[in-house]
Each structure stands twice: as C-alpha cells, then as structure tokens.
Amino acid sequence: MLIFYDYNSFFSCFFTVDENRDLKPHEQNKYLVFESNLMELFEICTKCCSPTAASITYVNGSMLKIKQSCEHCNYTRMWFSQPYVGGKPAGNLSISAGILFSGSMPTKVLRMYRFMKVACISSSTFMNHQKYYLYSAIAHVWHDYQKDYIRDVKEVRRSVVLGGDGRADTPGHSAKYGTNSMLDLDEGVVVDIQLVQVQHYFN
C-alpha cells in the first residue's frame, strides 16, 4: 500500500488527468493505492494484450519499481511509481517537506504510516532530507522574501518603524544561543531573525 502526500494541494483537488500530467511533481495530486489494485494494471501486455508476469523489484521509501514481462512478445518494461528530483524520489521528499513545513512530529507521522502498512521513509531519511535539502530551501525562500521586502520599501520610499525582540536563557542555564527578531510594526511582518550567542545579550 502506497501513499503520496501533497502538502501544496489542500485546495487544488479539481485537476483533470491531462492537467495533472503537465504539473511539476510537488504540484501533482497524490493518491493512496493498495498493492493488489496496483498490480492489476500490470496483468496485460501493453504491446500484444497477452497475460504478463509482474513483480515489485525495488522499494525505496514510498517509491517502488515494478518489472513487467511478456513471454508471448518478449516485451519487458520497468515502471517507477514516482519521478525523481535531484536523484531522489519526489514522493519521499514530499513526505519530509510535508512533515517539516506543517510543524508535525516526524516520529508520530512515520508511526502512523507503519500502523497503516504504508510504504514510507525512515526517520533517518527525514533527518537527511531536512539537513541537506529542506533547510537550504527554507533559507533560499527567506532570503528572497527579505530582498522583496527591501525592494518594496525602497520603491515606495516609505518610512519604517522597527521593533526588536530577543530571547535567551539567563547565564548559568544550558542554552548557548538565543534569537533576535526584527519586526516592521506598521506592516506586521518579520524583517530579520538572527541567531546569536547568549553572552551577547548581557555585554
């Protein structure tokens, strides 16, 4: 049983098949498919319409590979359940991104998949995706947001009223770092966030 979770499609459930085919992997709808129903699609040869033999030859998280062979016309094909993005199965990245961006607990989400017997990524895969891909994506979007904000302020030549807030434990506690946030009080938007050592708060 497979699941493909789309964190960007809560309000886009009205795509036709043709429309969905032209979308990027993260924009496409994903569906819950039972293994028995999936294998029914590989019972007939697409070349000569004879009965074929098919089996799941590889599983990587939520992605699987199926080999279909026809003894009548010797046709063989390999089918993948999802596209690859940067050498990684798109569904696996979507699951990790959905967990992180929704603020969910990865241990609980992945445990739910196991209880449902849904093919899914491991916790170590989620951590790797988070470290090497998702954090970088967040930083990229954040920097673009900051550039757009500064450009807009310059274009309209408006004055800006800024307010700051810092959070950190008091000396003697375990926290080594704290955060400083800067807010545009007129627009109600965060302008900047900086991670600083706790000792800087008291110097």
PLM features: residue spans?
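RNase H-like nuclease fold core
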Residues: 1-23, 36-43, 47-51, 61-90, ...
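Intrinsically disordered, low-complexity linker/tail regions enriched in polar/charged residues
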Residues: 26-30
